[in-house]
Amino acid sequence: MIQQESRLRVADNTGAREILCIRVLGGSTRRFAGIGDVIVATVKEATPGGNVKAGDIVKAVIVRAKKETRRPDGSYIRFDENAAVLIRNDNEPRGTRIFGPVARELRDKKFMKIVSLAPEVL
C-alpha cells in the first residue's frame, strides 16, 4: 500500500535509485496504491550519468509492494520491498531493463512490456 510521501526503490535502469510518491492517480479521493497502480513521484536519489536526475517529476507503476495483495484464487502475494518502474505518458517503460521479480497483476493491467522485460513474474 503506497500513499503520499512513501519512498520506493526503482527497479529499472533509468538512473533513478529512489523515488518519493507525491500523488496516486485515479481520482481526487484515492489515497492508496497497490501493485499495478500508477503514481506521480519525484526522484530523490539518482546515479550519475542516468536518464533522470534528482528532483525530476516522473510517472511510475508499482511492481512490488510489502502489503499483501489478494488474488482471485484466494492466495496472497507480498514482497520484501516497495519498488516501481518509471514509465512514459503512453505507459511504456522508460528503461530497457527491469531488475527483480514483478507481480502477475501487471499483466492484467496491460503493462505487457514490463512483464516481458522482467526476469521473473510471480
From Swiss-Prot:
One of its GO terms (cellular component) is cytosolic large ribosomal subunit. Pfam families: Ribosomal_L14 (PF00238). One of its GO terms (molecular function) is structural constituent of ribosome. Keywords: Ribonucleoprotein, Ribosomal protein, RNA-binding, rRNA-binding. The keyword rRNA-binding applies. InterPro entries: Ribosomal_uL14 (IPR000218), Ribosomal_uL14_bac-type (IPR005745), Ribosomal_uL14_CS (IPR019972), Ribosomal_uL14_sf (IPR036853). GO terms for biological process: translation. SMART domains: Ribosomal_L14. The keyword Manganese does not apply. Binds to 23S rRNA. Forms part of two intersubunit bridges in the 70S ribosome. Belongs to the universal ribosomal protein uL14 family. Part of the 50S ribosomal subunit. Forms a cluster with proteins L3 and L19. In the 70S ribosome, L14 and L19 interact and together make contacts with the 16S rRNA in bridges B5 and B8. This is Large ribosomal subunit protein uL14. The lineage of its organism: Bacteria, Bacillati, Actinomycetota, Actinomycetes, Mycobacteriales.
